[in-house]
Curated annotation (Swiss-Prot):
Protein name: Pole-localizer protein TmaR
Localization per Swiss-Prot or TrEMBL: Cytoplasm
Source organism: Glaesserella parasuis serovar 5 (strain SH0165)
Coiled coil ranges: 70-104
The protein's role, per its UniProt record: Pole-localizer protein involved in the regulation of several cellular processes.
Domain of life: Bacteria
Gene of this entry: tmaR
Family matches, as Pfam families: DUF496
A GO cellular component annotation in the UniProt record: cytosol
Chief location category: cytoplasm
Keywords linked to the UniProt accession: Coiled coil, Cytoplasm
Length: 105
């Protein structure tokens, strides 16, 4: 009897841990979504800025800088999208473990 209570308590602690971890991952995913959106806006801003800079301004270097900045922002968007995919996979695994805990009862 005592052993089953300990196991039941441990199962509850595991479930609470998984639930909190799942919520943490959801918050992190939402944060990454905001970062993706922000960086996509920056990409658009740089595209618009690039339209206003002309060659007769003799600032060809600015175009190179803007291109590099744009690439950096695009890379960030890709990195955040990859991270979101990893978080989503981890959330699915946690949901599966939580379902296993629930079915033990």
């Amino acid at each position: 009897m005592e052993n089953s209570k300990k196991q039941s308590f441990q199962d509850m602690l595991d479930y609470v841990h998984l639930y909190r971890l799942k919520n943490k991952l959801l918050r992190e995913t939402a944060d990454n979504d905001r970062k993706i959106r922000d960086n996509q806006k920056r990409i658009l801003l740089l595209d618009n800025l690039n339209q206003y800079i002309t060659d007769n301004m003799s600032i060809q270097d600015i175009r190179v800088i803007i291109g590099n900045m744009r690439d950096d922002y695009e890379n960030r968007v890709d990195d955040y999208a990859i991270r979101n995919a990893e978080l989503s996979k981890e959330r699915r695994e946690i949901r599966r473990k939580m379902a296993e805990h629930s079915s033990k009862k």
